[in-house]
């Protein structure tokens, strides 16, 4: 029997700041090796008989998801865009409704996974999923309980009930994150598992329980899916209908109340990578138990996580620290207090600082840009456009733009004119002028963009689809 993977990719990963940002959260990061967490989540399904994955994500991340799927040779036409966040119960309901509408299998088994988890033992993972198959096929709602390796206060727990089959249990209860003493008792008892947030069930089984236990969520999602707007690779859900949907997790909405919940134990080196300390736990270490990534010299140091993006970092005689350097931010924290990193993100949000939103180097489907300098009434960016790529015609009311080509050749549309701009040449785009840019060449186009004007906000962009032969595919992705 085949599975339909449903990958939940909507989180923000704020506890892994400054690497994880709102516009580029942790599920799109490569924490070990070259592949991102999202890509690894999908690749580990290779030994299972699965259909092309359904990915549920924030509208803002749609092109990141599509690009990362294409990089691992997966179809990118099953991406469900949540117009607003409503937690996991509605998100899974959207996938279940879509699966019943579109799947060749009339009632597929949905394998629901988070995009930002790490599983080190893929054989054990596959074995647990296969073991759960018979229960899910017969109408049970299966969750996977991680066998604890220690007393942990950072996870919720599942208490197992009666044995209903070989290494399969009824769910007795879901338990919130405990204090350290209670976590110790759970660990000693052997009856509690970490709540992984991974599930296996038939689409109809989930929707039937949702309809019975949380009818408002069911009705709102049913209506939202009834007004789907296909958009290239993306499945756009009706915003007004979905906004009326209550926000609730699958645990609260369904799993804690259903009579059909089953827990399958799993020992697979699982981590939700919810903090820098948990990332240190799963990373390869040197003989002093340091994790060193980048250009780093460490002497008489132990138990540290040190990451450098583009600077030389030297450390002497320090222990139990997390040091993370990016182009625009530096984090120094005790490994025992890294859960408080979210307070930094909250501070940045309150003060409307860009460091919580995105990196200085920002990747787009057409290429990337890097902010070089900014100040009152000006912004300077270095832009790289991939061969054959383009961004659509647009206009700004309050700013002008100067483009200076460093390498390659640009095809520029300005008003009714279309012309080529070559290396060491420049062009000027006045305010209120329709303009577009394309790289017609075989090599990357690199240029400097200087924005100047009284207002440089990203909401001063009027995009004009289908103008000057430019497709609408990259609309909203220029900025």
From Swiss-Prot:
Its EC number is 2.7.7.13. GO terms for molecular function: GTP binding; mannose-1-phosphate guanylyltransferase (GTP) activity. One of its GO terms (biological process) is O antigen biosynthetic process. Pathway: Nucleotide-sugar biosynthesis; GDP-alpha-D-mannose biosynthesis; GDP-alpha-D-mannose from alpha-D-mannose 1-phosphate (GTP route): step 1/1; Bacterial outer membrane biogenesis; LPS O-antigen biosynthesis. Belongs to the mannose-6-phosphate isomerase type 2 family. Homodimer. This is Mannose-1-phosphate guanylyltransferase RfbM. The gene is rfbM.
